[in-house]
Amino acid sequence: SRWTSTEAPLPTEKSATGKEMPSIESANRSSKKSRRTRHDQDKLMPGAGIEVFTSSDGFKIFVGRNADANERVTHKLARPNDFWLHAEGPGSHVVIRNPGRIKEPSQVALQEAASLAAYFSSARGATKANVRWTQVKHVRKPRKGPKGQVYLRRANTTLAEPVSPKVLFAPPKPTKHV
């Protein structure tokens, strides 16, 4: 399978032939543990460095504000069917929660999350920025890679205007009735 990197070339991997396989019991124990962890994900608090927004059409959006927060957003809070976004260059990892397991995010949620990804990146001062997006199951962390670095597969690109969350999610101004 082909992977593309957001920050570094794709490393080559050697096969693990000749390596001892863990016993079936230990494999079952580890799979039960990972299942339990997945069910507990809703209980995880976003924590320091993570901002949470709600799109206009009701989707939760998580934004990592530093390398540690990016790691937590992408690899701890996000589920495989959630949508992951990142603007070109250094910036925040953004995740759109996908509880209904839909194949593509709504255009509203995608554009709002892409605007946040562009705003919380080195493209903040630009008029438009390319933002790559995919499902979290297509995002991988390289072995021994620095925090926040990922490889993508099957990524799409959208163009977004960097918009501050204060502007993007501002309450509507009241209208005057005369």
Where are these regions (language model features)?
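Extended, highly charged segments
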Residues: 1-93, 97-178
